[in-house]
């Protein structure tokens, strides 16, 4: 959340609910009765990310209050694909004349500038997180409550995804992992 504030690109917050059972909660669904697609804030952010070079942060708050493997399964698989052009989710089975520009044959490409951040708790109201999720995540454990401190006022700075990606590539070249 704060990283989005610092980068001048607000994060999209998705408060995970215990009833989440499938991808519809994140990406929306086509309503056969109304013949309209019910979109979510997460889907809107993914779509809009294709039009900018910002770091687009999506926060899944309390993501293990429902089973991550159920509602985030498709995204876990997509993010493992080495070819970023294959990072697609099927939103509808076919295309229509008035489909949004970035929707091709019912599919939406997930831009690389979308970052998912999840918070998880470890208590009796949550589900354990499977190895499938842990294997695809960068985990930061906070085992105790932090000590309050005053941070210096820091001016926000627009940092593009391209800039961050360039810094990553430079760091990988300068400090190779053996």
Predicted regions and their residues:
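Amphipathic alpha-helical segments of the small helical/lid subdomains adjacent to P-loop NTPase cores
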Residues: 166-170
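AAA+ P-loop NTPase catalytic core and its hallmark functional loops
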Residues: 1-165
